[in-house]
């Protein structure tokens, strides 16, 4: 019987194929009293080691297929597996209660999950609960000899159907065979949606109950552009979806012709389309998609992929590779954004209730704790500056004195290198990320001292709306089109331009096709996004008449009071599916 469902359009693409149900194994077990608790501890150690090995392999594969940023979620999982406090408590429970490893694991991890989930005002801790749940499931499967579903074994064209896809599930999808996936839960900002867009696999999430409606082998039609899903479609519906898929493929081929074109609107205004990267390996994809710059190089992955602080020479080689790979095009490097969800095993930071609002990013860099590490990074960047057009920006800036402290270190190390006879470029722009509302509101003052702004919308929206975008309970508050967010962005752009400074954006909003027309009219100079979004965005911009968009932007900023009103207004001015 044919059924139609509507979900959240999370990743563009159209596909028709057989359903592949990703079924979770039965992980039930009996609690058993044991005499030899040391044997149970040994079983636990073996399961932990097997899980670590497994996740390390999955992470390596994710780096190759998805890039460092998407793969970073596995670092949190690996940290849970190596958490001495949790492991110690599990073993203590096994000994004290003379129970089997399965029961000890479940009792302790359930306790941690309950504690963290109870912190409703702390999204960071709730994310840690999800990490512990995923890791505990993997360790328990090894203890029971059960096999977790492995999407990497799919060897025919399929559409994956699941309640949810964990990051490790998504990282193992082979795009040669997996043409789309559909889940019961999730949204556009979930890890699986972000990974799907990187892989260029169609995805529809949040259908509520597709797993109860589909059987293995059913034909499923998925439109990741509209959010439509049809189970066992008619021949006519299959033909319609295939035609839509062919039209989308044709559209992508047309976009590819724009690889070497400048990004110019219909009335002749030029904007810079840049790409976000995490490692030098990403530069190949940046050039393949016709980026005019690197708008965000996340340097923290240099630290997260290392067992110790990366040396000045190691960093220099990485920065040099990116600058040379971009052949003179601008490269905006963000200094280390450590802290929050990015911890380093070799950097001892204090435990915090909410690390996202705590000791992180530039706050570490200009402190006594991070000063030497920061100076090493600045020296490496300065040495690499002669190999291309380097721009440096500092993350998580709230106060002018923070920028001044960081800029003073930059100036000191530049003078030191010159005194040592090391060649350094004298044309390095230094700017800041605008991701804290305090900096956005004081943009006119910052603009007098910085060379540029880059708006980090992911965090700016979260901090303005006090809502974690990865927390489904409050994800409705993550509203890029909320008039308060639009006014903040407009304020930043106008303040920068008043001082003759340029403004970029490196959050997901920069590649959002419905946001681009608004941002163009506000005067955003640089749009930095995932490399795979560049050609589509360039195609959209070529059709825009900025004069026509002016009324749209003015009305959105002055007349609208809700996100829904802005989205409804957009239908009058721009046609974006």
UniProtKB/Swiss-Prot annotation:
Gene Ontology terms: biological process: phosphoenolpyruvate-dependent sugar phosphotransferase system
Induction: Transcription of ptsI appears to be regulated in response to sugars supplied, i.e. is four-fold lower when cells were grown on lactose than when grown on glucose.
Compartments, record wording: Cytoplasm
Keyword Metal-binding listed: yes
Similarity comment: family membership: Belongs to the PEP-utilizing enzyme family.
Complex and partners: Homodimer.
Entry protein name: Phosphoenolpyruvate-protein phosphotransferase
